């Protein structure tokens, strides 16, 4: 899997069951903007030392925080959640 996936490619991988989106944004960000369907909220600090394995795609608001995981060979959504929204991909409300 490429290390930086365009939002559409990340969503396709999720729909095919090949990947899971790990959302490293804060709870405030998730509540304010929503989240991709099925995205799992995770702590970036906990995952910096040991990112999840293949099939994990990290997502932050603007693809800045998620770059930390790239150094460990993980994948990220290129452009972050902002690019996800710009692409018109599905978003769920977060309570």
Labelled PLM ranges:
Residues 1-20, 27-57, 62-95:
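Rhodanese-like catalytic fold shared by cysteine-dependent sulfurtransferases
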């Amino acid at each position: 899997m490429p290390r930086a996936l365009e939002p559409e490619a990340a969503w396709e991988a999720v729909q095919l069951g090949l990947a899971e989106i790990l959302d490293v944004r804060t709870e405030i960000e998730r509540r304010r903007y929503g989240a991709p369907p099925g995205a799992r909220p995770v702590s970036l600090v906990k995952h910096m030392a040991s990112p999840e394995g293949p099939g994990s795609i990290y997502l932050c608001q603007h693809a800045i925080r998620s770059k930390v995981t790239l150094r460990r060979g993980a994948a990220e959504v290129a452009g972050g959640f902002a690019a996800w929204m710009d692409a018109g991909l599905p978003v769920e409300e977060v309570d």
